[in-house]
Amino acid sequence: FYAGLILTLVNTFPYNISPASS
């Protein structure tokens, strides 16, 4: 699974998908 890829993506722009990450 692309867990690392997804994590990196979410870490790059989490405000674009889920603005719940501070």
Swiss-Prot record:
Q: What is its main location?
A: secreted
Q: Which domain of life is it from?
A: Eukaryota
Q: Where in the cell is it found?
A: Secreted, Cell wall
Quick one: a GO cellular component term? extracellular region
Which keywords belong to this entry?
Cell wall, Secreted
Name used for this protein in its record? 50 kDa cell wall protein
Organism of origin is Nicotiana tabacum (Common tobacco)
